[in-house]
Curated annotation (Swiss-Prot):
Keywords: ATP-binding, DNA damage, DNA repair, DNA-binding, Exonuclease, Helicase, Hydrolase, Isomerase, Nuclease, Nucleotide-binding. Its cofactor is Mg(2+). The gene is addA. The heterodimer acts as both an ATP-dependent DNA helicase and an ATP-dependent, dual-direction single-stranded exonuclease. Recognizes the chi site generating a DNA molecule suitable for the initiation of homologous recombination. The AddA nuclease domain is required for chi fragment generation; this subunit has the helicase and 3' -> 5' nuclease activities. It comes from Streptococcus suis (strain 05ZYH33). Its EC number is 3.1.-.-, 5.6.2.4. Heterodimer of AddA and AddB/RexB. This is ATP-dependent helicase/nuclease subunit A. GO terms for molecular function: 3'-5' DNA helicase activity; 3'-5' exonuclease activity; ATP binding; ATP hydrolysis activity; double-stranded DNA binding. Transmembrane segments: none annotated.
Amino acid sequence: MDGTNERRSGLMAFEQFLSAEEIKAVQLAEAHSDKQQKRTAEQIEAIYTHGQNVLVSASAGSGKTFVMVQRILDKLKRGIGIDQLFISTFTVKAAGELKERIEKKLNETIAETTDMELRRHLSAQLADLTKADIGTMDSFTQKLVTTYGYSLGISPQFRILQDETEKASLKKEVFDQLFADYLEEDENGAFRKLVRNFSGNRKDNSGFRQVVYQVHDFSQSTSSPTKWLKEQAVQADLYSQERIEQMLEQGFKEKVLDKLYQAADFFRYHVEWGRNDFGSAKYFANVEEVLDLLTGLDSLDQKDLMERVERILLINNQSRGKGLTNANRPKDEHLIAFKEEYNAGKSQIISELRDLGQEVYELTLLKDYQVQALPLLILLRDFVLDFSQAYLDVKIKEAAFEFGDIGHFAIRILEENADIRQFFQEKYHEVMVDEYQDNNHSQERMLDLLSNGHNRFMVGDIKQSIYRFRQADPMIFQEKFELYQANPQSGKLILLKENFRSQIEVLEATNAIFTRLMDRQVGEIKYDDTHSLVAGSPGQKIAQPKNEMEYLIYDQQDSANSSTDAEEETPLTAGEIEVVAKEIIRLHNEEGADFKDITLLVQKRTHNDLIMSIFEKHGIPIVADGGAASYLQSLEVMIMLDTLRVINNPLNDYALVALLKSPMFRFDEDELTRISLQAGTGFFYQKMEIAQQASGQHPELMSEKLKKKITDFLSILENWRAYAKLHSIYDMIWKMFNEKFYYDYVGALPNGSKRQANLYALGLRANQFEKTGYKGLSRFIAMIDRALANDKDLADVQEFLPQNAVQLMTIHKSKGLEFKYVFLMNIDKRFNLEDHYQSVIISRKNGLGIQYLADMKDKVNSPLPQVRVLMNTLPYQNNLQELKIANLSEQMRLLYVALTRAEKKLYLVGKGNADKLAEKYDGKKENGVLAQSTRESMATFQDWILAIDEAFSGEDLHFKKVFVTDEDLTEEKIGKLTLKSKLEDASLKDIRQSEDIAQALDQLSSVQELNERYKAAIELPSLRTPSQIKKLYEPILEQEGMEVMEKYQPKRTFNLPDFSKKPKITGAQVGSAVHELMQRLDLSWLVTEDTVRAALEAVHAEQAIKDKINVQMILDFFDTDLGREILANTDKLHREAPFASLQTDSVSQENFVLRGIIDGYLLYDDHIVLFDYKTDKYDQPIQLSQRYQAQMQLYAEALKKAYKIDRVDCHLILLGGERIEVVEVNI
């Protein structure tokens, strides 16, 4: 019997799950109810369907989170425990929000129900919510491996390898060693040939290394990397000569026939309708000859067909390439049009026949050389296998793993241990997953292993799958969708189409674009009635014509600054941003729109700085979610890194000169030149030593002042170098800050707070680096240098940001959010197609497709010893086409996500020359959709939308184009923000007469007299908290150690006033965050840095407050005696326990209720261990012990009364010092 049946077979009789007929009854009742916001029939079905796999396809804004919460709540009300549900979310933040919603609904249900048994059950679920399996798949697999990793020999004391620079460093070390081993054993030169194939003429192995990383990373997204590499990566038959011959004889023959039949129809039409007017022309005889060649095609094989093609091309090449061109000069307009149409059609046909000829030539050539690539491919696969194993061995040795490793360990544990797998399959009543469209194959395998085969609940929307770069595979969702659609016995498919977010103008525009853009061929799904958005409430259907979607196009009238070249990059321009600024000013001034309701979406953060500078010019507040990572390039950090480089190695000339010129030492160009001239060769440090002794080639250039400056520098540097040998990098950095006042110096510069935050973060990152197990300045510098060399900069430090401001974020960041006004910026930006030019393209199904560097010396008459030609193998070409469709489909989904963020109004923003754009698009369409060839050939959102506008110009597309020129963007026409007026001072003449004021003052005086008379009773609250009691007793407690001064002596200090607008973080804020963190911390598993940070992520506090919490100190607490006792007795643990106690005030003898929340206690049979967290700053622990003695005594008395236990041991956990301290309080 599984856990579900055991729980439901208890004493309490829970309601049974609804049958299909009962669900229909609920749907009918809901439809006829008078609710203002009714649940849809599909939402009800998704909430109550039970006993089978369910896939919910939830369109944007359809309330999928509402459905999930309601479904979970329904299961809890029917006797299922929260611990019997496995709920996977895409992000930690989403998990926290889901828990909050469940908690809120549970509290509401508990308050409403009168059934005491149900209340007890739901209260138990509320208490267990923090321990429930609601989180990311990564967090679950981490817990699973911590608990059961012993079965694979994995220590539970592992850490997560999250730092990209550390990962890159480890991978490089493993690769270099393996590369050297392979090179040493390469007797026949096969490995050198492999490396040359991917590195070309470069002298290093970087090209080959990137290929190895690429294949390795792809394999990690599969459920079994080793199995995929061995069984799928190399598919030898795809590289065989037989495969090309088969393609030429079968598939390609049909392609050639199709083109020739099209040509026959075209030329035959021209002969029939043009004989009378052009029959005597020279080209006409050539056309008739071509028609003769286009007869009897069915009986020809592929080789004969290509001979016909070649003969047609030869005929066309006559008369200098005009053999089939109508060169006549008719005067009749109809004949002119007929001639031009013929010439254009003929040119396209000849071009397509040439392409066919080239394709056949390349395939024939490939047939001889492609097979030579197979041994290299096998060797590449073997190298990647060895690299993957060696890399994993290093991570095992370091006890540091990537999330992908943890996922694969978890899969192995469940696959190889039937008892563990059975435990989880029996434990979970249902396996639920949110954002199912973004699952990868490793996560899908985990869900399969946790499920019993008929208890999966999956929610997602394939149209919002935008994480292919993380190896998410939307086809996992689509295959389930099609399976359940075709065979309901396999599972239930439920469509949530109603959108409850956007007004009808947004929905209609989105549908109009996507019904004409997305289908199975390009888009991977057909956007039809199944996927179209429908307004979910009557209010959304009320038309607001002014909110029709607008396509704002910055008209680049200067043709020299505009281009419609498909290959030319189109960066965001100042003109486009001015267009948006102008509209935002209008929205704010005329429609009263708040800045916080407006969001700008971009595809990349590359141009965030430009956007923010222009908005700042117009006074528009704006907040960005981050720019291009440039932390290591910030000037203050670069100077400190150069300082560390010099400390590590004074012979580093570049770093040394940078340090000398820095504000810390201020050597100028003249002084540096004088030093440099003291010796012709050698390092600059050596020249400084020579200059100091005035023994160089030009001692006359050295003044006493300069020599002293050099002496001071060398002395400081020697001192720093000696200090660095004995202390941590963190201490070294702060020593430099303090001795040279550099931290204070940058604080006085523009953006000083940001610069100081950067320096502070450098110290923290150095400290974090040393906690990973790595030690030493040289290794830290090497890690930083590798990060810079690999363009792996660190994230910028965030500052406090204004609340009422326009938001600027990427489309990816906006997913799941909603905003009243949305501007999609730079839609003429080209898609990122870099992966189309890789030397290896990978398909999950077809394996590796590679480019092969063939030696064609035998085909080419050349004096050179080798003639190497880079060939795209057939598998490479097939994988490239698959990749192109996948990338274009992803871009369509990205556009869909962007458009569906808007609630009220949507703006698209692009640019181009109006005249050129009008001529660019051909208007081709097929079956109500933009022509496939058109969609495949385009590489911007703008091209797609304007091509739709051209192809379907006679239809209502629910958006309007607005061209904006520079003349529309003058300072006068843009306008200025109208700020809200300040409150004007009140005038006495506008208020009541003076006698009324006098009467009011008399009444207030009498009230004051009464207040003074009964002050004691008035100030006694009926409810008090322990903190209030503590404050009451504090003056008395502190008197014992009080010294009375004869005379007041003010402290002679001067503190600069704080002019920053950033609110200070108070101790109370940090304390509240710490308390919430300790409440959220899951103590049922091993407490690690990752579990603490995961809990910290869910804490409701500003990031700046969270940054003040010392995670290491939290970890250190669980290494104390009390911490270990708590972990060993979680069954006796009570956290955040509310209490109430009746007390008597010692002054007024009035009764009052003391209420509070105890941080935590362990309840034993004969005694209680009480503990409380304190984040106060202190010099000696006894200070806090005395300060909180009275408060702890109140807690202890309340517990004694509640449990009838006399012994309560009290402890304060002090988190406000330099290290963790646990102090026992005597009461």
